């Protein structure tokens, strides 16, 4: 019994010292309250206060309300300068939390009022990544260009074209494409053509799917693309719109899942932490990665997500370490990056695990 207790992760510093990989982080949803205050101060005429952009401890919102929050945040990040500042701050915060490899995702946006184009939007993020690298932060950052379902298939095609251009010109910084946005808007079949085009061009696909119940057909259409990773997959294994067929398909193809506990509980797609689908996928040893989704909006950080998973599902420190180490397998960067990260983890292991 005592041994088991010793194995239980008890100190918060274990989680922050743990080297981590973050694979599901939306840029505009990851803005901390510190950065948000700076943005709000620059735009007093908008009359936005920081309580409009965060869901504090113990609070919940509907999924619809969460998407409305993003609209509010977009009003604050309307210029290339805003995007650059936000990118640098978000990267620094992830690095401070022990994240060694980060894939940020964001939808290119045009803002006529400031003259920001979709291209300058992407370039601002890339500049933020570049400047962070020059500051010698201990974090490797990549960018997935996101397709927002609300934009429809024509905008999706434009976004894919942009992603292809940057995929070719950035030497591995732009690695893939994300399909996200309000899951109640649009239909999967409308996005098949642009997504297939992206895949053909060599871009990796991370697709949000099965975020809401009763979407079996929609989910199967997206799964048939054989995405490289699945975002959320909340209802794949549920009686409401999930099915054994879907679970078997995901298992058979070993498609990794990006799982975000606080996000799902606070947006009420999952009733409680102990009912989170991480428990199901982890119990069958399926590739699963703990992620934050929107660390700003949901007032969390990756260390906290690991701690929540460990405490909810009774994971030992060794199991938590393995969960983090195995997440390296599912990054979109090259094999050489994977082996660099594994070296880093192995170097840190004796210090973090206190073996």
From Swiss-Prot:
Residues at which Zn(2+) binds: 24, 26, 208, 293
Gene Ontology molecular-function annotations: adenosine deaminase activity; metal ion binding; N6-methyl-AMP deaminase activity
Active site: 211
Cofactor dependency: Zn(2+)
EC class: hydrolase
Textual note on the cofactor: Binds 1 zinc ion per subunit.
PANTHER family: ADENOSINE DEAMINASE, ADENOSINE DEAMINASE-LIKE PROTEIN
Similarity comment: Belongs to the metallo-dependent hydrolases superfamily. Adenosine and AMP deaminases family.
Name of protein: N6-Methyl-AMP deaminase
Organism field: Homo sapiens
């Amino acid at each position: 019994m005592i041994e088991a207790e010793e194995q239980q992760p008890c100190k918060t510093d274990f989680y922050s010292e743990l080297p981590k990989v973050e694979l599901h982080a939306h840029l505009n949803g990851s803005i901390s309250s510190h950065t948000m205050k700076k943005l709000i101060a620059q735009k007093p005429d908008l009359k936005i206060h920081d309580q409009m952009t965060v869901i504090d401890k113990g609070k919940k919102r509907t999924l619809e309300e969460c998407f409305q929050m993003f609209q509010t945040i977009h009003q604050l990040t309307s210029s290339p300068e805003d995007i650059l500042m936000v990118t640098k701050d978000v990267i620094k915060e992830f690095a401070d939390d022990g994240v060694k490899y980060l894939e940020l995702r964001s939808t290119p946006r045009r803002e006529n009022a400031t003259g920001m184009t979709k291209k300058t939007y992407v370039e601002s993020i890339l500049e933020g990544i570049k400047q962070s690298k020059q500051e010698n932060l201990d974090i490797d950052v990549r960018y997935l260009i996101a397709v927002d379902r609300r934009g429809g298939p024509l905008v999706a095609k434009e976004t894919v074209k942009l992603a292809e251009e940057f995929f070719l010109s950035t030497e591995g910084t732009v690695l893939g494409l994300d399909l996200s946005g309000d899951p109640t808007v649009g239909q999967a079949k409308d996005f098949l053509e642009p997504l297939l085009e992206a895949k053909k061009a060599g871009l990796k696909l991370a697709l949000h799917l099965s975020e809401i119940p009763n979407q079996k057909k929609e989910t199967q259409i997206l799964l048939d693309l054989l995405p490289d990773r699945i975002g959320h997959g909340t209802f794949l294994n549920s009686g409401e719109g999930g099915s054994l067929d879907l679970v078997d398909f995901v298992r058979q193809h070993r498609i990794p899942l990006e799982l975000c506990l606080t996000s799902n509980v606070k947006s009420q797609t999952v009733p409680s932490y102990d009912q989170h689908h991480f428990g199901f996928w982890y119990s069958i040893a399926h590739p699963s990665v703990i992620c934050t989704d929107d660390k700003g909006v949901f007032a969390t950080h990756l260390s906290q997500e690991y701690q929540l998973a460990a405490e909810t599902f009774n994971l030992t420190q060794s199991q938590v370490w393995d969960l983090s180490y195995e997440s390296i397998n599912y990054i979109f960067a090259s094999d050489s990056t994977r082996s660099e990260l594994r070296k880093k983890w192995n170097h840190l292991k004796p210090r973090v695990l206190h073996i």
